[in-house]
Amino acid sequence: TKSMLMIKQILTNLCLTGLLTLSIACSNKPAELEVEQTTFDLGDVRFRDGVHHISTSFKNIGDSTIHIRKILSDCPCTTGETDKKTYPKGTKGIIKIQMDLSSFFPDSITKKVRIYTDSPIREYEEITIKCKLLSN
């Protein structure tokens, strides 16, 4: 009957509206950090070379703002910092890393720095720094 037909049309329109709304919501990409360079090989390094400074850029490739929660390393000899903690979509930043190997013995060394964010895609991005520490 006519009332059943109207109910079907209303339900169809509601379903189509819901699907359209869902597809628009899903088209937004969550906040995500993309680091330009994640591995550094410094080669042969001497004790007397002092503190090593490394930097790399990153970009928020998502459609919403990303927040840097913390930057941690696997060793107190290595630290990292960014110039700010909040990056709107499409913006770039730089992480500056300092590595002081003066207390280490000659050996192959690998250090890791993690940038923790509020991205739902990945909890952190990791940067790896390698070198071979030589005696003076």
Regions picked out by a protein language model, each given a short descriptive name:
Residues I95-S103:
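Short, hydrophobic beta-strand segments
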Residues C26-I61, L133-N136:
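Beta-sheet-dominated interaction scaffolds and their linkers
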Residues D63-K92:
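Surface-exposed binding patches on compact interaction domains or structured appendages
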Residues F105-L133:
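Terminal connector regions
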